[in-house]
Amino acid sequence: MRGGESIDTSMGLTPLEGLVMGTRCGDLDPAIPFYLAKNLGMDNQALDDLLNRRSGLLGLCGVNDMREIYRRIAQGDPTVVLALDVFCHRLRKYLGAYWIELGRLDALVFTGGIGENDAVVRARTCAGLEGMGILLDEAANQSVGKGERRVSRSESPVAVLVIPTNEELEIARQTLEAVGG
């Protein structure tokens, strides 16, 4: 956001572009669907199903529930470690791209299910980004809380915030605006 206006999104025409998600692939080499069609005989419907519903975390490690991922990490499963590495790497990659596009960063906001509830993903995303002015407060990050909260250190040039989302309320607001209410 710049001046209250969105300047970009990680999604393209569809949510397939961008970040790795629970079941969606995120960015991938455009030749992959052609390769799969040619070498595995996959048709358009099979490719759509694979990329939208059987990829992402699910495709990388077999599960898309972060609780199960952490349970399996504790058991030493290397596939879930890889999946979490890929997930956080993509977050950091997009964060860096947006930082460059904006020219500076005032705040890094974590929202949505994982952003609001997963201290490990927040910590791994922020790790090593002190040069960007992101100084995470580990204790604040680990604390469980509801509502908006700051999880960066007080001296952090960039505020790191956890802000709960209310998608239903936003949909209702936009619907009301669209119908002229």
Predicted regions mapped to residue ranges:
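Internal helix-turn-beta structural module
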Residues: 81, 85-101, 105, 115-181
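Short gly/pro-enriched beta-turn/loop segments at secondary-structure junctions
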Residues: 28, 52, 64, 103-105
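A mobile "lid/hinge" subdomain adjacent to the ATP/sugar-phosphate binding pocket shared
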Residues: 40-83
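Glycine-rich phosphate-binding loop of actin/hexokinase-like ATP-binding domains
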Residues: 1-38
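Alpha-helical scaffold segments in soluble metabolic enzymes
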Residues: 32-36, 46-50, 68, 97, ...
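Short beta-strand segments
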Residues: 1-2, 111, 163-164
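Generic structural signal for well-ordered, non-membrane alpha-helical segments
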Residues: 25-29, 40, 44, 62, ...
